Amino acid sequence: MMNVNVLRLDHRIGRDTRITTHVCLTSRAFGASKIYLSGEEDHKLMENVRDTADRWGGNFEIEYAKNYMGVINKWKDNGGKVVHLTMYGSQAHEIVSEVQKSSADILIVVGGAKVPGKVYKSADWNVSVTTQPHSEVSSLAVFQHLLMDGKEFDLEFENPVFEVIPTAHGKNVNIHDENR
């Protein structure tokens, strides 16, 4: 399986905290192994995401990246491919098979404020999840779902403290005290 990382552009403390947190959690839940945050360095947000990942299992990483183009360029220099999610790109459902056929690791770039043209130019694919304005969280979730062929439903996260057991009614949560 390909390695998927996410790059969140231009985080702003206070204004973007909730949406960036949701981008991080969505990345993790849908199979990414790491997220890079650019913009303002938000230690509290990063610690909250690490804490959530620790409690719910897996090896998800979060890293601050002052220079987002440095992340993109290094990714490409190491043979990786870049997918930039934008409402102006090729339709996700039409391009995802091409992305899947690539044997390269994938960096998904999710915008914040106005995305500079150099991000569009550096992307191997500019990808749209519909051609309508909506949330970067929903774009990320839909694209990762397509990229994973729905296999994110079968992901197992190692050493969780909390583990939800699917049930039609009520809540069923296993608590693994040994992982605290």
From Swiss-Prot:
Compartments it resides in: Cytoplasm
Record-level Gene Ontology MF annotations: tRNA (cytidine(56)-2'-O)-methyltransferase activity
GO cellular component: cytoplasm
CDD domains: aTrm56-like
Keywords: Cytoplasm, Methyltransferase, S-adenosyl-L-methionine, Transferase, tRNA processing
Broadest EC class assigned to this enzyme: transferase
Family of this protein: Belongs to the aTrm56 family.
Subunit and interaction comment: Homodimer.
Function comment: Specifically catalyzes the AdoMet-dependent 2'-O-ribose methylation of cytidine at position 56 in tRNAs.
Entry protein name: tRNA (cytidine(56)-2'-O)-methyltransferase
Biological source species: Methanobrevibacter smithii (strain ATCC 35061 / DSM 861 / OCM 144 / PS)
